[in-house]
Amino acid sequence: MQAAEANAKAANKKHMNVLFIMADDLRPEMGCYGVKDIHTPNFDRFAKGAVLFDNAFCNAPVSGASRASVLTGMYPNYPTRFIDYTCKASVDAPDAIPISGWLTSHGYHTVSNGKIMHHIEDHADSWSEAPWRWHPDGYDVYWAEYNRWELWLNSESGKHINPRTMRGPFCESADVPDSAYDDGHVLAKTLVDLCRLRDMGKPFFLACGFWKPHLPFCAPKKYWDMYPSVPMAANQYRPTGLPPEVQNSGEINAYACVSTPDDQEFLRLVKTGYYACVSYVDALFGQLMDELDRLGMADNTIVIVFGDHGWNLGEHGFVGKHTLMTTSTRVPLMIRVPGMAKGVSKSMVELVDIYPTICDLCGIDAPVQQLDGKSLTPILRNPSRSVKREVYVQWQGGDNLQDNRFNYAEWQKSGNTMLFDHNADRDENANVSGNADYAPTVNRMSKEMKKVKKFAFRKKWTK
């Protein structure tokens, strides 16, 4: 009913456009986030004119659940809502209105290119135009046909197929232009749309979802060539006292040519491939920003760029996402708003904050009793401000609360707990939840977790 009532409130021409850019599996591995060994000149340039959130976190360390959470502004709720990659917001929370539908009902023209919702059919009717992908079937069809839809381009890749999944190699370096791979097509479509939407006469919400640096690590050769060597993680071992619920992701094993995390040559190739893909996305992002400037639209367009969750690159002996370690949950988030501040924010923020922030910046009311996040507008006006003390993450029955010092998690079924003190152990190498000195912290954060969950699950949104 809220969306129907909102139809009467058309957005006026003073409302700013929104360019909403997501990159799959992108952790804060950029120069602007202090990583010296990676080449991200375009992200770094953008960061200088934006607010960079240094303590931004996803709410679920897997694409399907994270994206459903971002686009509805709602926390995951195990075991009924946003629990894994298979989830759909339209099924798990059928009464919730996605940001696309909310903006459409308020007079925005909304467009989805590439990977925005994990499943292209999820809330497809909430957009002004049908969501677009170069290959609508997604990454689950025609795996063995390596040249079917620009996933693998080297003929050699077609000789290496995982017989269990029919997927090709976990990485590829093809001597091709940026436009050859799938993300090149996503950029091309977005550039055309940007020009088209400029002349439409109404504000727009243009979502651009890059597939990389998600597996497989396939990027043009010139980006691989940037990394003749990459530094390896120093803590390639399981943290002491880590609960058994925290395990390595098996995602990469669905591809061909895979080894184990203790194989240093394999691990080096994993990190090199990830870095190459990040630099590839950086180059595409730079082209998009250049076109925004060329079209004269930068002064009336909000730009939001972020990753949907983190990724382990050998830390803790893990390769992939799917954990409650900070390497899996911390994400890059940068927001540029014409006329507002630029700088670095140390405030704890989470991806559910994006929805209310967009509503606030666009001058429209938010859906009643739906959103779990807070608007980041106070920080966008003054980066020294803070809007919250902690963030909430959930994964496979594990509840996670992080603040500026601690990473705490608990599993209700087993009673196991996890606590890392970032003042003493920034890399999370020792679980101290069983240390008597930290008992007050465990009790405090456990109580705070219950408060967060009580607020977040105040209303039943599932069928």
Regions picked out by a protein language model, each given a short descriptive name:
Residues M1-W411, N416-T417, R426-K463:
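Formylglycine-dependent sulfatase
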Residues N423:
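Residues forming the ATP-binding cleft of Hanks-type serine/threonine protein kinase domains
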